[in-house]
Amino acid sequence: MTVNLLNFNQAALAEYFQGIGEKPFRAKQMMRWMHHFGVSDFGEMTDIAKALREKLAKEAVVAPPSVHLEQISEDGTRKWLIDVGAGNGVETVFIPEDDRGTLCVSSQVGCALDCTFCSTGRQGFNRNLSVSEIIGQLWVANKALGRDPKGDRIISNVVMMGMGEPLANFDNVVAAMNIMLDDSAYGLSRRRVTLSTSGMVPAMDRLREECPVALAVSLHAPNDALRDEIVPINRKYPIAQLMAACQRYLEKAPRDFVTFEYVMLDGVNDTAEHARQLLNIVQDVPCKFNLIPFNPFPNSGYDTSKPDNIRRFRDILMQAGYVVTTRKTRGEDIDAACGQLAGKVQDKTKRSLRRIKVEAVA
């Protein structure tokens, strides 16, 4: 059976080479060719012995996922629909800024968590992505963007904030992030790789031990009653448990704060009282806030908070001494903004079908 070498981080690749009678150092060579240089043809890997190249050509491949569609926004944001087979596709977004280039990477085909304000969740869930399908998004984007003439990185930051809950696909996501961090591959620092979770507490503890990168938490509500409703995983891991997990995570994190993401939903979670409740629940967690104006999608049932309400909410947090950013909406014209990623999901949960039936009855 043909082996896709993009599924291996360097440790797994060393095991693979030992298994075929080769020295483990071949793993470092292969990592550089695959990821640093973006080469998928063994014949072009000139410092690898010809006999080994011929052997690899018979039993292995370097096979990134294919791009079904590429779109470029008026603001320079780029979105790729990545074909992952069986009628499924995931979306990857590159956001260029003056001081950085951020790639937003998906971890699952759809999402099983069913947050009520998220377009991805509305699509249901099909499966976890493999390591090659996760790191392949970075591979594909690097190829498409080319090299900066000045030698600077075009992709300087990676955020695991695309489709899916990364910690629900723990092993594959961590293996892919290890490739991102590997100096023989992409060489990103732990501070420049951010994982966003809705709050899978046991997996947060495991991540702290196995691959502590920068942490963002999709909080979105300042009390359990509201969070139970809009972020259903809160029923399993309520806010007190989540805050305690954040404190534990910071013991080994590369940054000394957690970023709390908070989508601004008109009349739902955006009042001054909500802001004061938010200050109360985070008081023991060093943090900053990222306020996200809701990006509408069809039949969402929500509206974006009014600008004055967002400013009032922000000011209450800032007056308490916190760093607060309000996320700029990028790529909205190509549905690449936060919460808009939907891809193509062959839903195995039948969630989307159930919702259609409910809406039809209503």
UniProtKB/Swiss-Prot annotation:
CC annotations in GO: cytoplasm
Q: Which GO terms describe its biological process?
A: rRNA base methylation; tRNA methylation
Swiss-Prot/TrEMBL cofactor(s)? [4Fe-4S] cluster
Residues recorded as binding [4Fe-4S] cluster, renumbered to this chain, are 111, 115, 118
Q: Record keywords: Ubl conjugation included?
A: no
On cofactor binding, the record's note says: Binds 1 [4Fe-4S] cluster. The cluster is coordinated with 3 cysteines and an exchangeable S-adenosyl-L-methionine.
Q: Which UniProt keywords apply?
A: 4Fe-4S, Cytoplasm, Disulfide bond, Iron, Iron-sulfur, Metal-binding, Methyltransferase, rRNA processing, S-adenosyl-L-methionine, Transferase, tRNA processing
Q: List the disulfide bonds.
A: 104-338
Q: Where does S-adenosyl-L-methionine bind?
A: 164-165, 196, 218-220, 295
4Fe-4S keyword on record: yes
Residues of the active site = 91, 338
Source superkingdom? Bacteria
State the family named in the UniProt similarity comment for this chain.
Belongs to the radical SAM superfamily. RlmN family.
Q: What else is known?
A: Reaction proceeds by a ping-pong mechanism involving intermediate methylation of a conserved cysteine residue.
Explain the purpose of this protein. Specifically methylates position 2 of adenine 2503 in 23S rRNA and position 2 of adenine 37 in tRNAs. m2A2503 modification seems to play a crucial role in the proofreading step occurring at the peptidyl transferase center and thus would serve to optimize ribosomal fidelity.
Stored NCBIfam families? rRNA_mod_RlmN
Name the record gives this protein: Dual-specificity RNA methyltransferase RlmN
The organism is: Methylobacillus flagellatus (strain ATCC 51484 / DSM 6875 / VKM B-1610 / KT)
Q: What is the lineage of its organism?
A: Bacteria, Pseudomonadati, Pseudomonadota, Betaproteobacteria, Nitrosomonadales
Per the record, the gene is rlmN
